[in-house]
Amino acid sequence: MSIYLDNQAAKPVDVRVMAEMTLYFNEKFANPASLHCDGDIATDILEKSREQVANFINAPNSSDILFTSGATESNNLGVIGAARRLKKKGNHIIISEIEHISILNIGKYLEREGFRVSRVGVDRFGKIRLDKLERLITDETILISISTASNEVGTLQPTAEISKIAQEKGVLFHTDAVASESVIPIDVQEVPIDLITLSSNDIYGPRGVGALYLKKGVRVNPIIIGGGQERGMRSGSENVPGIVGFAKAAEITKKEMPQESEKLKILRDKLIKNVLDTIPKSHLNGHQEDRLPHNAHFRFDYIEGESLILTLKEHNIAAATGSACSSKTLEPSHTLIAMGLLHEEAHGSLLVSLGRTTRETDIDRLLEVLPDQVKRLRKLSPLTPSDLLKKYEEVK
């Protein structure tokens, strides 16, 4: 049986979520837009689900939640929709250099529409430089979009401070919270944020469902035109079974997050300590303390991350080198390059992301396999220095 340690890319659907969804596939399957009794039932469950997702982030009004097909659509609707709506006010948008690929490509798309997009830098741990962010804001700035945490190296961003800066400057603030939503609480009444991207699968719900939170008074131009569902901002018949699953996943995650996050942090810390202690020339990417409790992102000198993933695959261990959404390219991680790493350093990375089903025995097995596989690849690498090879020979 394989050991799954790629939870940042995809998570299994919780069995309790699947059980909740079943009824809405073949019994209560009507369209919420229909006027008959079955349509009323679908509308009721849709609005109940909206309330549950709103409660997940402590949103005061369930109408603040728009359902979408997932995080990429929510990012598009939030950033493109807000930018187009505010174009008469200004044409300047700020994102970070280490955003998810969907936000980076949205930035390029908006530049082709005539918007000016600035990309704020990060420090060597992947944390936003707040001083640089403030200096980038002008009278033309209408939107800041910065993720709550890096989906790759796991560094938590100073969301509260960014929110304060945005409020003081009268600029909308959008955050993609997908990387953190399963392990870090979101409270929009404690930290005011204008737009938030959420994903169902990242809290162990079904894929193909997401949401965009819009603070009261904030509106976006629709990017999908049709029947005017979701307050006229996101057309298309709602995916009721998926939304029911999303809502159940939100309910479970909110309740179990404190204990689950602590469990994951203990496993993560055990993994990090043992890897850094037992494998020479190994490094932790991202911030040591301000990081996601389920994220461990390493780099190993003198080897390729892709080769390491393939050797772990031989031992039925699933891990990654970085973001799944850009893993098919052989280019070095844009996040690691932005953090100041050289191309050859960025290529030697391994992302281990833990989840609800991760057990301590999974970590033990990885720690049993990983040192030998790193050693094996280094012996084959022309980059490995002779003194390290000699040490490996001495401990045979």
Where are these regions (language model features)?
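Pyridoxal 5′-phosphate
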Residues: 1-396
